[in-house]
Amino acid sequence: MSQYTDIDRLAVSTIRLLAVDQVSAANSGHPGAPLGLAPAAHVIWKQMRLNPKNPEWINRDRFVLSNGHACALLYSLLHLFGYDMSIEDLKHFRHLGSKTPGHPEFELPGVEVTTGPLGQGISNAVGMAIAQANFAATYNKPDYELSDSYTYVFLGDGCLQEGVSSEASSLAGHLRLKNLIAFYDDNQITIDGNINVSFDEDVSKRYEAYGWEVLHVENGNDDLDAISKALEQAKLSDRPTLIKLTTTIGFGSLNAGSHSVHGAPLKADDVKQLKVKFGFNPEESFVVPQEVYDLYNKSTIEPGIEANKQWDALLDAYVGQFPELGAEVKRRLAGEFPEGWESKLPTYTPEDSAVASRKLSEIVLDNVFDTLPELLGGSADLTPSNLTRSKGAVDFQPPITGLGDYSGRYIRYGVREHGMGAIMNGISAFGANYRPYGGTFLNFVSYASGAVRLSALSGHPVIWVATHDSIGLGEDGPTHQPIETLAHFRAIPNLQVWRPADGNEVTAAYKVALTNKHTPAIIALSRQNLPQLQGSSVEKAVKGGYILQDVDQPDLAIVSTGSEVGIAVEAAKVLAEKNIKARIVSLPDFHSFGQQSKEYQLSVFPDGVPILSVEVLATSGWSKYAHQSFGLDRFGASGKGPAVYEKFEFTPQGIATRAEKTVEFYKGKQVISPLNTAF
């Protein structure tokens, strides 16, 4: 006998028709997947632990719609389950300024992550599952289980075809993340037509090879009991589970099973027959029977609110039993760092020895790692090069492997840069003040640009430790030497891109990156040693740009970043011998500098002083700050780092020569600062 009633089936039909009505009202959107996935959504959400009155409750279950184009389904669920999503909001689907944008966006209560670029959501979900396992292993005690939530995911064929999902799913299998349950919408349709035009692999065997539990629901269109049974079985597994859910895209539509129902509104006659088929009045839209509201209120909302109350009481008891850990949990849930943590940050003087900035980064991480338990680090198989693993760190690994445990805070991502980026977004989205950081070579952050862009769009404050930041890496040559990379990432809104020149600037980069709650950061670091510079300080560098060394009435300003700043300082000495006075400006982060007042920016780059930028990467983007740019608008070369710098004339004399030409060119001309603009 089925555990589901006619009211459950009415609820499924309600979900379907709310999604269809949204798409029809907007005359835009994707009705096909919501029609096919509504039964699974009903089964999952009905048993989820959630509290719509406290959507950020840390021990809630999480739902990720990786196939974000099906967002009309998610918005319907948010309305039905009591979140801040009204029928009027649904009627404004895809309208400018609405709560119902064309793909789910992170800031909306109940939306766990921004999805749309396929494959990102399932990868974010892996990150959430990692964070939950780590939080549980760190704080759970006998009789005090603070964390035992699940992460559920919907994904489609498109997600599975994107490489990022393979990277993340492979790692999830290795890590045996049993709190992760994914539903694969096996509807056999893509935008181009039947899936067989491009995709005929055995997804089940693929995920079995990853180390996942794989189950199959043959009739995902209306077999609620089979879906529920698969879900119960998944919860018994000691591994992540993929439930292959065979559905019909556009179920109930006249065009069901066709690619035409994927991304276009149903025609009016189709909508009417669909409503008749599901027992609704064909002349009415956005209808929710009271029985459906009552069903979800009784099955999910009221129990969720009560579970949250019980959890709050459990936390209070936990604080009494484990005062130190309890205070730490409360601090993290409040999104705060420990008082005085900044005292752990190192500072430097010019008398200190020259050190590679990747090593300076390691020193910062070593100093703060024990103080900040929310740091969850890792590297894409470059730990010895990135220097990202702190002394005494334990690896995040399944205990069964003997390689670490789930309380470990260092993740071996393998050669999976894109997966790492998307997983870090999920770790951040989990909450509890998690601050993930991941290491790779700067050039290979480009592999993960899709995830980096979503970090910035969503405001996930993840940190990329991006070493080997220039031709200075030497012998590995142009395949590994970044050229366009910084210009690309600097163009992304809400993204810090640091290229520190010495120890104080490395410290400043981490200080700003860690204290900023809504902006991710890439910290580009050198392989070669860099001197500690006269005039640098953490206090100046946190502004993103500052005058490192100044002169009275400068003939020009040389602005630079990273390893070239020290060379620019030497170039100024060459120029001084020719009676040319150069102001030296260090600009480690365009974004942070852009946050300063216009008055401050113009004090660094005033009218009347020609500006030459020097950076051994592409010159694109430098016109914002400089009149002339000396950079590398070609690929690098293989050889010893100093020899490669010499080849491309990034030497004191090479910079001085271009500085002289800049001074000569602007002599007698009115020089307006590039920052002195109309708006």
UniProtKB/Swiss-Prot annotation:
Thiamine diphosphate binds at residues 69, 116-118, 158, 187, 262, 417, 444. The active site is at residue 417. GO terms for biological process: pentose-phosphate shunt. It holds the Pfam family Transketolase_N. Binds 1 Mg(2+) ion per subunit. Can also utilize other divalent metal cations, such as Ca(2+), Mn(2+) and Co(2+). Binds 1 thiamine pyrophosphate per subunit. InterPro entries: THDP-binding, Transketo_C/PFOR_II, Transketolase-like_C_2, Transketolase-like_Pyr-bd, Transketolase_bac-like, Transketolase_BS, Transketolase_CS, Transketolase_fam. The keyword Calcium applies. GO terms for cellular component: cytosol; nucleus. Substrate binds at residues 30, 262, 358, 385, 468, 476, 527. Transmembrane segments: none annotated. SUPFAM superfamilies: Thiamin diphosphate-binding fold (THDP-binding), TK C-terminal domain-like. One of its GO terms (molecular function) is metal ion binding. It is an enzyme of class 2 (transferase). The record marks 30, 262 as: Important for catalytic activity. Keywords: Calcium, Magnesium, Metal-binding, Thiamine pyrophosphate, Transferase. Catalyzes the transfer of a two-carbon ketol group from a ketose donor to an aldose acceptor, via a covalent intermediate with the cofactor thiamine pyrophosphate. Homodimer. Belongs to the transketolase family. NCBIfam families: tktlase_bact. This is Transketolase. It comes from Kluyveromyces lactis (strain ATCC 8585 / CBS 2359 / DSM 70799 / NBRC 1267 / NRRL Y-1140 / WM37). The gene is TKL1.
